[in-house]
Amino acid sequence: MVSPPAITISNLTKSFGNQEVLRNLSFEVPRGQTYCIIGGSGQGKSVLLKHVMRLLLPDSGDIRIDGESIVGLSGASLDDIRKKMGMVFQESALFDSMTCLENVAFGLTMHRRDLSAVEIERIAREKIRLVGLNRVETKYPSEISGGMKKRVGIARAIALEPEILLYDEPTTGLDPVLATSIDELILKMKAELHVTNLVITHDMNSAFRIADRILFLYQGKIHFSGTPLEVRETPDPVLGQFVRGETSGPIPVIAEETSP
């Protein structure tokens, strides 16, 4: 029997007031693949990610994780699905009052009541080493660099050994060298942990490095879906303008308002 895709989005529609953000959106993410969602600000990328996490409910359509619809789930059933997913937030979202070790152990403490404190600490230390960090366990987030915070965030996301990793702008705020190192870590996690990755990003260099497939979200729809090579070579004027970062083309540029 063929396994279902890790993530299936079917005819997903979401509006806020009179603004339709997602319009009849459909795509699948096969197991073990890395899919990058690109698109301009306000195009619905974060809204889409919140639906996958079931932080938002669609107006219509369906979201399936491992073939199971999550739209109607609640309570323990929803918690079980969420344990299959690890989230890496844009700003790392570490707890300032906790050490790095405590941050990584947080999910284990909350969801693995069957584990002793010693076992939880062992797993947390193991995940910290896996993301390439040393001697940060007793440090607080304010005492480490932005790149290290990203790694601690990834360590926390993999602590419960999820099947799916969701990344929200993982290279934002990093210099090119650190951004490349995070991309390499994402690829390492995919290879060693056999996870499926869904990545929201504005960083085209990152998308080209890590993606098996890139989906371009524009005006609430998947405007283009293709491999990194297909995206690079696309004749599509909308996608081409976005990828090249050009100000002239079909995508309007909104000028910043200035004070009188």
Functional labels for PLM-detected ranges:
Residues 53:
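Helix-to-loop junction immediately C-terminal to a conserved catalytic motif
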Residues 165-168:
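Catalytic Walker B motif of ABC-type/P-loop ATPase nucleotide-binding domains
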Residues 101-109, 121:
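Short helical segment in ABC ATPase nucleotide-binding domains corresponding to the A-loop/adjacent helical element
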Residues 159-163:
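A short, proline-enriched helix->beta-strand linker immediately N-terminal to the Walker B motif
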Residues 68-69, 117-135:
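Conserved ABC ATPase "signature" region
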Residues 140-144, 148:
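Conserved ABC ATPase signature
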